[in-house]
Swiss-Prot record:
Residue pairs linked by disulfide bridges in the UniProt entry: none
Assembly notes: Part of the 50S ribosomal subunit. Contacts protein L32.
CC annotations in GO: cytosolic large ribosomal subunit
Protein name as annotated: Large ribosomal subunit protein bL17
Record flagged with keyword Ribonucleoprotein: yes
Species, as recorded: Dinoroseobacter shibae (strain DSM 16493 / NCIMB 14021 / DFL 12)
Gene Ontology molecular function, alphabetical: structural constituent of ribosome
Gene3D superfamilies, A to Z: Ribosomal protein L17 (3.90.1030.10)
Record keywords: Ribonucleoprotein, Ribosomal protein
Matching InterPro entries: Ribosomal_bL17, Ribosomal_bL17_CS, Ribosomal_bL17_sf
């Protein structure tokens, strides 16, 4: 019986899972939309929702708690400066999961996880900035 099993192991060790979700949460915060497998998306949702709740609090302790979960300080800065104020009036439900078919290689169910009311220009913004910098260098 699987009673009281709190989360999926995803065939990884605890440290590997922790690093996986830290990286995925950072990517979601940076791009505001990512495509991944459905079980990973379902496990990522509560992690990101709790990070947004920390960003809504906005105090120093909340910032340090978020920094302990995320890999880069740029993610923490965007979380507290952009996403926290954006969802200040919303009581939960910051993330949406949409099914996206099956992966070609192994038929794994795929999903798109994104922020509700996301900034559509955020996805690919780093690539656009890098291309603009390359054009300026020429």
């Amino acid at each position: 019986m699987r009673h009281a099993r709190g989360y999926r192991r995803l065939n990884r060790t605890h440290e590997h899972r922790k690093a996986l979700f830290a990286n995925m949460a950072g990517s979601l915060i940076e791009h505001e939309q990512i495509k991944t497998t459905l079980p990973k998306a379902k496990e990522l949702r509560p992690i990101v929702e709790k990070l947004i709740t920390l960003a809504k609090r906005g105090d120093l302790h909340a910032r340090r708690q978020a920094a302990s979960q995320l890999k880069q300080h740029a993610y923490v800065a965007k979380l507290f400066d952009v996403l926290g104020p954006r969802y200040a009036e919303r009581q939960g439900g910051y993330v949406r999961i949409m099914k996206a078919g099956f992966r070609y290689g192994d038929m794994a169910p795929m999903a798109i996880i994104e922020f509700v009311d996301r900034d559509v220009d955020a996805k690919g913004a780093a690539d656009k900035a890098r291309e603009a910098a390359d054009e300026d260098a020429l």
